[in-house]
Regions:
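Ligand-binding beta-strand-loop-alpha-helix segment within the catalytic cores
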Residues: 1-2, 58-132
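N-terminal glycine-/serine-/threonine-rich phosphate-binding loop
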Residues: 1-34
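Glycine-rich N-terminal segment of FAD-binding domains in flavoprotein oxidoreductases
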Residues: 28-55
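Glycine-rich beta-strand-to-loop/alpha-helix junction loops that act as flexible
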Residues: 36-41, 133-137, 198
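A glycine- and small-aliphatic-rich helix-loop capping segment at beta-alpha/alpha-beta transitions
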Residues: 48-59, 84, 146-156, 214
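Class I SAM-dependent methyltransferase SAM-binding "motif I" and its flanking Rossmann-like core
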Residues: 138-184
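ATP/nucleoside-binding phosphotransfer catalytic cores, i.e., glycine-rich phosphate-binding loops
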Residues: 185, 189-244
Length: 244
């Protein structure tokens, strides 16, 4: 399966294109279920979406959001959590109320039961209409890490040492002890997927993705099995690559 690959001039143009696509999907389907990744790459996209709230208030009024993943063992909404970032840049600015938001608690008393709750809610609320993803340095998608096998549904994840170096955690005194993440089958069940890849530091994982080799040791490669996904990357990430 060949993916539509769009190479943008820079991170700003990538974010503008991504925001335009998310907005079009939202206007086309009020009540859309958006799966939102945290991290630095999608933040500008969310900021640009927030600028459109007044103009498209009716569409945003019914928007539903599911959090893609979360760092386990950190206080909910604490420094470095996905919850904190999404609340600041997406949920708050877009006026997404608690009734229209589904997210892992970062420090549940029973992580397995928390994942079971998310699985049940996603069955009830899903499938995901549009999933916004980033590309991990080791090829992880959400917190689905390279492994001999991948989990299909929401689960407790063992985090790779490279993942624990994520910039989101740089200012957090506490470090996560596990991950909470949607599974690959839930991600691939999305009606549409946007993969955002920005920066020269993502050049190597993008090169591996473009091999078109599907392997559990590089979870992002499973996106090649999806019939409606788009790779948006900037020139810094795509430099020297054959994106055919």
């Amino acid at each position: 399966m060949k993916s539509p690959i769009l190479v943008c001039a820079d991170a700003e143009s990538l974010s503008r294109r991504a925001a335009k696509r998310v907005l079009a999907a939202l206007v086309g389907k009020p009540g859309l279920l958006l799966c939102a990744a945290a991290g630095s790459t999608p933040l500008r996209t969310y900021q640009l979406l927030a600028r459109q709230r007044e103009r498209h208030r009716n569409a945003f009024r019914k928007l539903r959001v599911v959090k893609l993943d979360e760092w386990g063992g950190l206080p909910l909404g604490g420094l470095g959590t996905c919850e904190q970032q999404l609340e600041k840049h997406l949920l708050g600015p877009l006026g997404v109320s608690g009734k229209r938001y589904l997210g892992f608690h970062s420090n549940p008393s029973d992580p397995e039961q928390e994942c079971a709750r998310i699985r049940r809610c996603l069955v009830s609320e899903g499938p995901i209409d549009l999933c916004v993803l980033g590309l991990g340095m080791n090829g992880h998608v959400a917190m689905n890490e390279p492994a001999p096998s991948l989990q299909p549904q929401a689960h407790v994840a063992r985090l790779a040492s490279l993942t624990l170096l994520h910039p989101m955690l740089a200012d957090s005194k506490l470090k996560p002890t596990f991950g909470l993440t949607l599974g690959m089958a839930e991600i691939l069940a999305s009606r549409e997927v946007l993969l955002l890849v920005s920066g020269a530091n993502k050049r190597e994982p993008l090169r591996k993705l473009m091999r078109h080799e599907i392997t559990t040791e590089f979870p992002a490669s499973f996106l090649w099995l999806h019939s409606n996904w788009t790779l948006l990357c900037d020139r810094a990430a795509a430099e020297g690559l054959n994106t055919e």
